[in-house]
């Protein structure tokens, strides 16, 4: 709760979108009590919109309305897209808060989109019609990076829940059924698969998969071997970036060889 106050208290939001709860590792987690508590500490709020995602019983939260109520009274209108300046604020990211209260980092429309298009199309080989997945929460900058794939005409694939529930192959089943072209994850996840002797290629076809991205920590040479022996012949890219630039410092290069334990290119 304090983490929300430390961040949102600085920007004084007027509208806040929340979910009543979420599912993880086979369990339902209720968020309503926390929402009621921290929204009471944000005096700038004029409206709290709650998505009935986990179908939990409602509690009374000041100035709240369900998303379903909004839809019931909604009449479709033509969307008007406002033209703004290249550096017009797009979204606010936050520093980790390890050296004090998290710092607000404002990213602009033009710079963010151009950088992401460059990284997607040139470094990650994303094309129109591709199906791009990155296992990430909405609070990680990889979420913002993933969403920008829409700008290339790709389909963004989303997964909500544990990557190991009901078993360690759940994400690969998703990748196979939905024909992922790009699969993004963390080095820790790949290491977990390796330690548990998970062999996705023995269970799934993964015929459309062409790129695997790994980030969050260095990808060991043994994990490179694991991917090529147990997933298939793909472009494996160990990438690294940061919230402050909401993009990458180093990532893949599709036109040069992949060498085990090494990052391909610096931007």
Q: What are these language model-derived features?
A:
Residues 89, 95-98, 120, 132, ...:
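Conserved S/T- and glycine-rich ATP-binding loop of Class I adenylate-forming
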Residues 81-84, 261-267:
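Short Gly/Pro-enriched turn/cap motifs at secondary-structure boundaries
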Residues 152-154, 180-184, 194-259:
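Gly/Ser/Thr-rich phosphate-binding loop
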Residues 15-86, 196-197:
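ANL superfamily adenylate-forming
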Residues 111-131, 140-181, 196:
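Conserved AMP-binding/adenylation subdomain of ANL enzymes
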Residues 49-50, 61-94, 101, 109-116, ...:
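Conserved pre-ATP/AMP-binding loop-to-beta segment of ANL
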Residues 14-15, 33-48, 131-133, 157, ...:
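Conserved helix-loop-beta element of the AMP-binding
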Residues 1-38, 104-106, 155-163, 192, ...:
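Short beta-strand->loop structural element characteristic of the AMP-binding/adenylate-forming
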């Amino acid at each position: 709760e304090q983490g929300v106050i430390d961040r949102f208290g600085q920007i004084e939001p007027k509208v806040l979108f929340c979910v009543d709860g979420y599912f993880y590792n086979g369990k339902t987690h209720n968020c309503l009590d926390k929402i009621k508590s921290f929204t009471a500490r944000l005096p700038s709020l004029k409206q709290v919109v709650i998505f009935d995602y986990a179908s939990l019983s409602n509690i009374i939260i000041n100035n709240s309305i369900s998303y379903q109520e909004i839809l019931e009274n909604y009449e479709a209108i033509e969307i008007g897209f406002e033209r703004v300046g290249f550096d017009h604020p797009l979204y606010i990211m936050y520093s980790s808060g390890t050296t004090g209260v998290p710092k607000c980092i404002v990213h602009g429309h033009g710079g963010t989109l151009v950088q992401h298009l460059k990284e997607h199309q040139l470094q990650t080989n994303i094309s129109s019609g591709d199906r791009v997945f990155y296992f990430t929460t909405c609070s990680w900058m990889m979420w913002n990076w993933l969403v920008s794939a829409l700008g290339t005409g790709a389909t963004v694939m989303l997964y909500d829940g544990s990557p190991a529930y009901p078993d360690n192959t759940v994400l690969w089943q998703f990748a196979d059924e939905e024909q992922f072209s790009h699969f993004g994850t963390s080095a820790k996840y790949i290491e977990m698969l390796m330690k548990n002797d998970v062999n996705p290629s023995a269970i799934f076809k993964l015929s459309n998969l062409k790129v695997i991205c790994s980030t969050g920590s260095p990808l060991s040479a043994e994990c490179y071997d694991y991917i090529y022996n147990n997933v298939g012949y793909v472009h494996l890219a160990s990438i690294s970036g940061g919230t402050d630039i909401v993009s990458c410092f180093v990532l893949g290069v599709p036109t040069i060889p992949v060498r085990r334990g090494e990052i391909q290119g610096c931007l």
